Amino acid sequence: MESYHKPDQQKLQALKDTANRLRISSIQATTAAGSGHPTSCCSAAEIMAVLFFHTMRYKSQDPRNPHNDRFVLSKGHAAPILYAVWAEAGFLAEAELLNLRKISSDLDGHPVPKQAFTDVATGSLGQGLGAACGMAYTGKYFDKASYRVYCLLGDGELSEGSVWEAMAFASIYKLDNLVAILDINRLGQSDPAPLQHQMDIYQKRCEAFGWHAIIVDGHSVEELCKAFGQAKHQPTAIIAKTFKGRGITGVEGKESWHGKPFPKNMAEQIIQEIYSQIQSKKKILATPPQEDAPSVDIANIRMPSLPSYKVGDKIATRKAYGQALAKLGHASDRIIALDGDTKNSTFSEIFKKEHPDRFIECYIAEQNMVSIAVGCATRNRTVPFCSTFAAFFTRAFDQIRMAAISESNINLCGSHCGVSIGEDGPSQMALEDLAMFRSVPTSTVFYPSDGVATEKAVELAANTKGICFIRTSRPENAIIYNNNEDFQVGQAKVILKSKDDQVTVIGAGVTLHEALAAAELLKKEKINIRVLDPFTIKPLDRKLILDSARATKGRILTVEDHYYEGGIGEAVSSAVVGEPGITVTHLAVNRVPRSGKPAELLKMFGIDKDAIAQAVRGLITKA
């Protein structure tokens, strides 16, 4: 254990005074807003005071400085006390706290990154610790810096499985630069938390997950100072026994006060009572950090060379992804890869082989994997690429949604999409993923159809802001592009055209190749079709689609290895809605599939070359 230097009585009293000022600010802000969670703030007041004004090292006027210690408020509903901390530190004006939750203020009801001191958005509970793990992993293994990471969790969110995924991850990777503080205030939103104040059980659970676990009185600044000063040979959990509404007579420890601001008259009485306990108005200055984090530049990362494929050769886009990522890894040591124990299927194992120190095995914990990536990406320290079966990203949709709210720049590659994976059956088939990722506000959705396009998608994703999703397929398909083909986000490609095309057919991945095969069948009948590769499903190349449709008598046929809802067909329909003389016909998977050979399943669900040819004939006959 490190030697513990007990703060003198003056410092301890100053920390107590700071905690009470944080309480007062939280109460004032929530009362002014008419909403918020003052009692949840009050249970954490001493924790926040000791953390920010005794333990943490940071530049108070530069919250995102790369050398600073990191803090994640996983119990995001306690945002007012986070804002109060930064006012106490001098970064925010005290008066700004009274604008909490106003549309004109950046002080949202829960933390968001438009605030310079917030790295990741929280409020959807159970996700903060995973992001903190990503920050700690980056600090220990990539930056090799001395900054530490602190995460404050509520006891209610400890029912979330994602918390324990993160606990396991931190232990496996020996994140001794990570401290989780559990604010055990006994009460959840509508009922007491399941373990209430059974502190020994919390301790045993943390220890079982490989953490150094310390029980403290969460309202004793001295005990907190001592706990934060303990040994750092493994991740540390400080299990703080606290009381919701601490310091408020008649409210402390009582149920039914969650998310309820105090009426003005009541707030004034409470504030007067708390204020009477403050002995000094003197503020504690933040301690600056050790400046040993390396300078990092992740802008404009480019492939070291063009693709090296040969037209006509066959490769699965999932394998092309692995090769492309490994190649991009040679362009920057800040390209990192994460996988959920599927690296031999997603082919991220190629990256691991070439860059073992930058590969993070997250095991079968997809929610945590996404949170880890978000943490790794904070402060522009890395460019993360996560991979697993596309179907399994659906489990992490809330984490992906919160990543968008966090303004995070992460890249997710989902393999094994659609019925074309074959015999493994419907549990492994991604048929909802396009709908899911299209709905995310900051997303770019790549759907490459050959090895060249896949390599370009990886390069573009590394340089595109927001959430990038790359959809890859299991079957091997022919290379259709030359290695020097230029690709851009939102730019589709015309793969096949003639002056007398009668229908525009839009497919991607496996179905693009089926469309090309259908074109060969139809050509024998003297029917020409135009074949489009959208490349990105979001954003969609509306202009090229409209131009092609107008050149083919207004007829568009979309074909996709995905359910009807939310996929390529609906994206195209939305793009052309209101345009006169244009009709869109959809071919897609229309029910829960089954096991079978890929060709059998494509035929069964009407998305193979024969179904496309038949649909084209039907459209022409209608005319």
UniProtKB/Swiss-Prot annotation:
<dbReference type="InterPro" id="IPR049557">
    <property type="entry name" value="Transketolase_CS"/>
</dbReference>
<feature type="binding site">
    <location>
        <begin position="123"/>
        <end position="125"/>
    </location>
    <ligand>
        <name>thiamine diphosphate</name>
    </ligand>
</feature>
<dbReference type="GO" id="GO:0046872">
    <property type="term" value="F:metal ion binding"/>
</dbReference>
<keyword id="KW-0460">Magnesium</keyword>
<feature type="modified residue" description="Phosphoserine">
    <location>
        <position position="295"/>
    </location>
</feature>
<comment type="subunit">
    <text>Homodimer.</text>
</comment>
<keyword id="KW-0786">Thiamine pyrophosphate</keyword>
<feature type="modified residue" description="N6-acetyllysine">
    <location>
        <position position="260"/>
    </location>
</feature>
<comment type="function">
    <text>Catalyzes the transfer of a two-carbon ketol group from a ketose donor to an aldose acceptor, via a covalent intermediate with the cofactor thiamine pyrophosphate.</text>
</comment>
<feature type="modified residue" description="N6-acetyllysine">
    <location>
        <position position="204"/>
    </location>
</feature>
<dbReference type="InterPro" id="IPR005475">
    <property type="entry name" value="Transketolase-like_Pyr-bd"/>
</dbReference>
<dbReference type="InterPro" id="IPR051424">
    <property type="entry name" value="Transketolase-like"/>
</dbReference>
<feature type="binding site">
    <location>
        <position position="416"/>
    </location>
    <ligand>
        <name>substrate</name>
    </ligand>
</feature>
<feature type="modified residue" description="N6-acetyllysine">
    <location>
        <position position="538"/>
    </location>
</feature>
<feature type="site" description="Important for catalytic activity">
    <location>
        <position position="37"/>
    </location>
</feature>
<feature type="site" description="Important for catalytic activity">
    <location>
        <position position="258"/>
    </location>
</feature>
<feature type="binding site">
    <location>
        <position position="185"/>
    </location>
    <ligand>
        <name>thiamine diphosphate</name>
    </ligand>
</feature>
<keyword id="KW-0106">Calcium</keyword>
<dbReference type="Pfam" id="PF02780">
    <property type="entry name" value="Transketolase_C"/>
</dbReference>
<feature type="binding site">
    <location>
        <position position="40"/>
    </location>
    <ligand>
        <name>thiamine diphosphate</name>
    </ligand>
</feature>
<feature type="modified residue" description="Phosphothreonine">
    <location>
        <position position="287"/>
    </location>
</feature>
<feature type="modified residue" description="Phosphoserine">
    <location>
        <position position="104"/>
    </location>
</feature>
<keyword id="KW-0832">Ubl conjugation</keyword>
<dbReference type="InterPro" id="IPR005474">
    <property type="entry name" value="Transketolase_N"/>
</dbReference>
<keyword id="KW-0597">Phosphoprotein</keyword>
<keyword id="KW-1017">Isopeptide bond</keyword>
<keyword id="KW-0007">Acetylation</keyword>
<feature type="binding site">
    <location>
        <position position="424"/>
    </location>
    <ligand>
        <name>substrate</name>
    </ligand>
</feature>
<dbReference type="Pfam" id="PF02779">
    <property type="entry name" value="Transket_pyr"/>
</dbReference>
<dbReference type="InterPro" id="IPR009014">
    <property type="entry name" value="Transketo_C/PFOR_II"/>
</dbReference>
<feature type="binding site">
    <location>
        <position position="345"/>
    </location>
    <ligand>
        <name>substrate</name>
    </ligand>
</feature>
<feature type="binding site">
    <location>
        <position position="156"/>
    </location>
    <ligand>
        <name>thiamine diphosphate</name>
    </ligand>
</feature>
<feature type="binding site">
    <location>
        <position position="185"/>
    </location>
    <ligand>
        <name>Mg(2+)</name>
    </ligand>
</feature>
<feature type="binding site">
    <location>
        <position position="428"/>
    </location>
    <ligand>
        <name>thiamine diphosphate</name>
    </ligand>
</feature>
<dbReference type="GO" id="GO:0009052">
    <property type="term" value="P:pentose-phosphate shunt, non-oxidative branch"/>
</dbReference>
<feature type="modified residue" description="Phosphoserine">
    <location>
        <position position="345"/>
    </location>
</feature>
<keyword id="KW-0479">Metal-binding</keyword>
<feature type="modified residue" description="N6-acetyllysine">
    <location>
        <position position="11"/>
    </location>
</feature>
<feature type="modified residue" description="N6-acetyllysine">
    <location>
        <position position="232"/>
    </location>
</feature>
<feature type="binding site">
    <location>
        <position position="392"/>
    </location>
    <ligand>
        <name>thiamine diphosphate</name>
    </ligand>
</feature>
<feature type="cross-link" description="Glycyl lysine isopeptide (Lys-Gly) (interchain with G-Cter in SUMO2)">
    <location>
        <position position="352"/>
    </location>
</feature>
<feature type="modified residue" description="N6-acetyllysine">
    <location>
        <position position="6"/>
    </location>
</feature>
